[in-house]
Amino acid sequence: MAKISVVSDGQAAVDVLLLGAAGNSGRLIAAELAVRGLCVRLAGRRRGPLEDLARVLAADGAATQVRTVDVSDAASLADAMAGVGLVLSSIGPFARQAGPVIDACLTAGVSYVDIANE
């Protein structure tokens, strides 16, 4: 598996921004990415569930960051994407949520994969 890694401003490398990280699919995906040694920026609407997930992953030695994000806000998305090479989105519904995320990824030049299970 090819590893995507970006280091910016002396911060820890963040490989993947995972939108919807605290959801059913997101938690499983975050765990799999962590097992593979990727640093995951866990992102979603509410900080509490993201921090809970980060603690669980950290107990297994995973490197994570937590970021709240509003996908309807371009500035919020741009901030969450800073320094990542790939955005994985598990948020839905796709028809309503994907457009702003795709636009932000195109603007930032970041790769995008939608994995919403709707």
Q: Which positions does each model-derived feature cover?
A:
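N-terminal Rossmann NAD(P)H-binding glycine-rich loop of SDR-like oxidoreductase domains
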Residues: 16-33
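Rossmann-fold cofactor-recognition segment
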Residues: 57-73
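ADP-ribose/adenylate-binding Rossmann-like module
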Residues: 104-118
